[in-house]
C-alpha cells in the first residue's frame, strides 16, 4: 500500500522573467519537510513547475500524492488534459506553437508516472496556511540566493 503524501507548492518571481524562487511542503502523518530553491533568471511558471518537480523528486518510493498548487498553469495541465494533447501533438499547442517549458513538463511527466498524483487548485495569497508558507519559502529563496 502506498504512503499517502500531501504536497503544497508555490513559485515566485521578482520580475517575470527575473530572479525566482520556489517552495514546497511535503506532509506525511505528523512529519513535515520543507524544500526551497533559487534561480537567477526564470519565470513564475518555471518556478511553479520546479516546485512540483522537486517535491515529487524528494519522494523515495512510489506514493499516493495529493498535490496542491495555486498555479492554474500546473493544475490545469493535468486536470484539463493539456499535457495529453501536447504530447500527442509533439509538444505543440492547439495554435501549432511550441509548448513553453517543455523541458520541465517532461520531467514532471516522468515523476508523476512513478506515483499516483491528484492535482488540486488552491487560491493563492488567501487564508491557506500551507500555501502561504510555500509562498514565504519561495520569496525567502529569492532573497537568500545560493
From Swiss-Prot:
Source species: Chlorobium luteolum (strain DSM 273 / BCRC 81028 / 2530)
Cofactor(s) annotated in UniProt: Mg(2+)
UniProt binding sites for Mg(2+) 2: 10, 135
Catalytic activity: Endonucleolytic cleavage to 5'-phosphomonoester
GO biological process: DNA replication, removal of RNA primer
UniProt cross-references to Pfam families, sorted A to Z: RNase_H
Name of this protein: Ribonuclease H
Textual note on the cofactor: Binds 1 Mg(2+) ion per subunit. May bind a second metal ion at a regulatory site, or after substrate binding.
UniProt keyword Nuclease present: yes
Organism ancestry: Bacteria, Pseudomonadati, Chlorobiota, Chlorobiia, Chlorobiales
Record's GO cellular component terms: cytoplasm
Major localization listed first in the record, in broad terms: cytoplasm
Subcellular location: Cytoplasm
Domain of life: Bacteria
UniProt-listed Enzyme Commission number(s): 3.1.26.4
PROSITE patterns: RNASE_H_1
Amino acid at each position: 500500500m502506498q504512503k499517502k503524501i500531501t504536497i503544497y507548492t508555490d513559485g515566485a518571481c521578482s520580475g517575470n522573467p527575473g530572479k525566482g524562487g520556489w517552495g514546497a511542503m511535503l506532509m506525511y502523518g505528523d512529519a513535515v519537510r520543507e524544500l526551497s530553491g533559487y534561480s537567477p533568471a526564470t519565470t513564475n511558471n518555471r518556478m511553479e513547475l520546479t516546485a512540483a518537480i522537486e517535491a515529487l523528486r524528494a519522494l523515495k518510493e512510489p506514493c499516493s500524492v495529493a498535490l496542491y498548487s495555486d498555479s492554474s498553469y500546473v493544475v490545469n495541465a493535468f486536470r484539463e488534459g493539456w499535457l495529453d494533447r501536447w504530447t500527442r501533438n509533439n509538444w505543440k499547442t492547439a495554435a501549432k506553437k511550441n509548448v513553453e517549458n517543455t523541458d520541465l513538463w517532461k520531467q514532471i511527466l516522468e515523476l508523476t508516472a512513478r506515483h499516483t498524483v491528484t492535482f488540486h487548485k488552491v487560491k493563492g495569497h488567501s487564508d491557506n496556511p500551507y500555501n502561504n508558507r510555500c509562498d514565504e519559502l519561495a520569496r525567502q529563496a529569492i532573497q537568500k540566493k545560493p
